[in-house]
């Protein structure tokens, strides 16, 4: 696979993480660039690891994973999205302590993993072509880090306009990303 094709693949793999990051950025209260970059690194790291895992699986059991990957991603993103919508419709918007937990490491990692399942499937397919999986994974991780950082900051602008409804927007965004992944595989 040539370098241009690898770059296109890397940015294609980052699009669903970018969409989720816009939703995440909308619910954060004025995230700083350093916070957006930290979240980008988490997403990028997970997005870089999943093609490696997929590549290893592709060497052994590709048909089992490919049959279910889109359903897993859709389910995880829908559950996370519904929870965000629920939180956004609470009359008090939740306590300040609860708001601080919305971007907890666990929740961030779950969202990142949910949006990276397609990268795992790509890793499975990369097992069958001549590609340096280490370079491909690194490029996917770097592209995702960049796109998520941009998405968080773009979401910040959306969140300041939408106020407490930003969480509903974020939840709907996650559900839409999950539906997009599911639709693309059916």
From Swiss-Prot:
Any one of the GO CC terms: plasma membrane
KW Transcription (keyword) present: no
InterPro entries recorded: Mntp/YtaF, Put_MntP
Function field: Probably functions as a manganese efflux pump.
Main location class: membrane
Disulfide topology: none
Record GO terms (molecular function): manganese ion transmembrane transporter activity
Membrane topology: Multi-pass membrane protein
Subcellular location: Cell inner membrane
TM region positions: 3-23, 39-59, 65-85, 109-129, 133-153, 166-186
Assigned keywords, A-Z: Cell inner membrane, Cell membrane, Ion transport, Manganese, Membrane, Transmembrane, Transmembrane helix, Transport
Protein's recorded name: Putative manganese efflux pump MntP
Keyword Plastid set for record: no
Native organism: Alcanivorax borkumensis (strain ATCC 700651 / DSM 11573 / NCIMB 13689 / SK2)
Family classification: Belongs to the MntP (TC 9.B.29) family.
UniProt superkingdom: Bacteria
């Amino acid at each position: 696979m040539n370098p241009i094709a690898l770059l296109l693949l890397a940015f294609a793999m980052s699009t669903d993480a970018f969409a989720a990051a816009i939703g995440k950025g909308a619910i954060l209260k004025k995230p700083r660039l350093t916070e957006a970059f930290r979240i980008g690194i988490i997403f990028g790291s997970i997005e870089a690891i999943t093609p490696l895992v997929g590549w290893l699986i592709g060497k052994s059991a590709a048909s089992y994973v490919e049959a279910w990957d889109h359903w897993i991603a859709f389910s995880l993103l829908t559950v996370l999205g519904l929870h965000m919508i629920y939180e956004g419709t609470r009359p008090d918007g939740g306590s300040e302590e609860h708001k601080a937990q919305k971007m907890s490491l666990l929740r961030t990692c779950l969202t990142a993993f949910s949006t990276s399942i397609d990268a795992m499937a790509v890793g499975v397919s990369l097992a069958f072509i001549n590609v340096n999986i280490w370079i491909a994974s690194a490029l996917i991780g770097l592209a995702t880090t960049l796109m998520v950082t941009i998405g968080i900051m773009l979401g910040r602008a959306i969140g300041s306009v939408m106020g407490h409804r930003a969480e509903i927007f974020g939840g709907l965004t996650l559900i839409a990303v999950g539906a997009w992944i599911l639709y693309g595989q059916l």
